[in-house]
Amino acid sequence: MKFVDEAVIKVQAGDGGNGVVSFWREKFVTNGGPDGGDGGDGGDVYMVADENLNTLIDYRFQRFYEAERGKNGGGGNCTGKSGKDKELRVPVGTRAVDIHTNEIIGEVAEHGKKVMIAKGGWHGLGNARFKSSVNRSPRQKTLGTKGELRDIRLELLLLADVGMLGMPNAGKSTFIRAVSAAKPKVADYPFTTLVPSLGVVSVLPEKSFVVADIPGLIEGAAEGAGLGIRFLKHLERCRVLLHMIDIMPADQSDPAHNALTIIDELEQYSEKLAKKPRWLVFNKVDLMSEEEADEIIQNIIDALAWEGDYFKISAANRQGTKELCMKLAEFMDTLPREAEEKTEAEKVDFTWDYNHKDGLAGREVITEDDDDWDDWDDEEDDGHVIYVRD
């Protein structure tokens, strides 16, 4: 199935049901009081994480999703039925972003998690709500409010422990093939990797971690050049980054300059991402003598002023890959997993109001005329008084 990590949709929460004007009428009761019920609340729209999904491709074909409208109220103080919620099932790791404000509405990072992305409208009030000591037969009601309408961008962020970055043809996909059961495409031309891929690395029966490979970065990626900038977001949840450096590039470019380019593009894209733990991995050491490889590696380290961890491997021959994976597994045990950033509902600016309170404090009140209804207070029929409670 095609990998789709972004989709734009429109969601419409259900409108609230209207209140109703009704009076109690039955045999021997000709002047019963008001018994108009409230409407039902509109349905909400939710995003629900499903571990059985791994792409957002379904949301490329259907772009509009709508929750159910609340039912209108009825006589006999009957409240209308609330509208049915709409649930959008998405892969684990998906977040919803408001297109117009770039506000992160919420994200689902574990199976079954549910986040509201559009709020349904509040119910309208029936005329029974307007009964007072001075207005015994109110003919007023309120309408249900509109459900929230939002344009939303769904973004899928892969959940991985280790993220790989580097220039095209640095050997990232070859490394994943060497250490896991994943089989990404490998070839001797740039941008062989067109979409991110995941591999599970098992170093011991009880120790494993997930590695994410994204398309290679090139100079100017932060301004949109190449493919990698589209997928850098998938590294945001990784706990450590592996910077793969080809010490003998096929295009005869300077490996030190290439390494500096990757670091510069990473810093331009996200300061937070650039501050993540990062290891240098020098690949293709089998293509030259050990002395030549050590000399090139030292030149790169000096150019980067690097003081962190680095490793020498040959992904094609699996030289040094086992030791690197063992070190990564040990590092995972010492590095606590980042706490999930929770988006609290109170901080999300939904556009609904608490209209069940506003109904008596300035919201539009509808007055219905009906000659069949008798007002036993003998009020003049030349107009209606609408009382607003403070």
Curated annotation (Swiss-Prot):
Q: Which CDD domains match?
A: Obg
Its required cofactor(s), as named, are: Mg(2+)
Main subcellular location of this protein, as a coarse class: cytoplasm
Family statement? Belongs to the TRAFAC class OBG-HflX-like GTPase superfamily. OBG GTPase family.
Q: Which GO terms describe its biological process?
A: ribosome biogenesis
Query: What does the UniProt keyword field contain?
Result: Cytoplasm, GTP-binding, Hydrolase, Magnesium, Metal-binding, Nucleotide-binding
Against PANTHER family, the record matches this protein to: DEVELOPMENTALLY REGULATED GTP-BINDING PROTEIN-RELATED, MITOCHONDRIAL RIBOSOME-ASSOCIATED GTPASE 2
Recorded protein name is: GTPase Obg/CgtA
Chain sites annotated for binding Mg(2+): 173, 193
